[in-house]
């Protein structure tokens, strides 16, 4: 290994190759409240700037978790502290107002194979790409200048299943109707790959994928 400091890209590539590095590659994420507090205390940047300040080795170009009904956010009821909404995946959940936290899952619109095939499947396949390809390419070019390891990011099939069907329907269907489960995962994967391909076609050449 060279005695000079490695770039983030070199560092991460050496990590995957099980070679020595000058330090452990690093990356971080922040709760929205963390950045908001820092900004009140004098921070003049957003979380992307903070990652650059901390010499993060990774740079995410885009996030792909395809909504089935893009833009849908229907407030069903609310009180002083929470609001219950129908989201872009057709689910109903109760969220805190003004702060982050795990929502209470109230219900899921896709609760049967019939609903999936009649409404959700065609809507998901027909929805336009929700990834901002221009922003992704801009981040790619900036990351290359900074020597960072670039990646496309998204969620794998099980998380998509839980988001669309809910845990109870999802787990029962794995036993009772596995072909339906395979189809949901296949459609989700197809749409995610389509969105990533759009970023590549726009000019980005990412180093890899980071899938949650």
PLM feature spans:
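Catalytic cores of TIM-barrel enzymes
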Residues: 1-212
């Amino acid at each position: 290994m060279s005695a000079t400091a490695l770039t983030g890209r070199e560092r991460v590539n050496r990590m995957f190759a099980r070679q020595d590095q000058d330090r452990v590659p690093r990356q971080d994420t922040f709760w929205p409240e963390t950045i908001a507090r820092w900004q009140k205390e004098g921070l003049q940047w957003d979380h992307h700037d903070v990652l650059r300040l901390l010499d993060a080795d990774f740079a995410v170009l885009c996030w792909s978790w395809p909504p089935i009904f893009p833009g849908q956010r229907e407030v069903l009821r609310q009180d002083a502290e929470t609001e219950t909404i129908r989201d872009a995946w057709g689910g109903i959940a109760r969220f805190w107002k003004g702060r982050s936290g795990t929502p209470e899952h109230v219900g899921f619109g896709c609760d049967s194979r019939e609903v999936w095939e009649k409404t959700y499947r065609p809507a998901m396949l027909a929805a336009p790409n929700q990834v901002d390809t221009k922003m992704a390419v801009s981040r790619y070019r900036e990351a290359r200048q900074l020597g960072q390891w670039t990646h496309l990011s998204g969620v794998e099939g099980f998380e998509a299943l839980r988001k669309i069907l809910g845990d109870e329907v999802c787990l029962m269907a794995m036993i009772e109707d596995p072909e339906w489960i395979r189809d949901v995962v296949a459609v989700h994967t197809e749409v995610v790959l389509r969105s990533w391909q759009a970023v590549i076609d726009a000019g980005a050449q990412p180093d890899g994928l980071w899938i949650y």
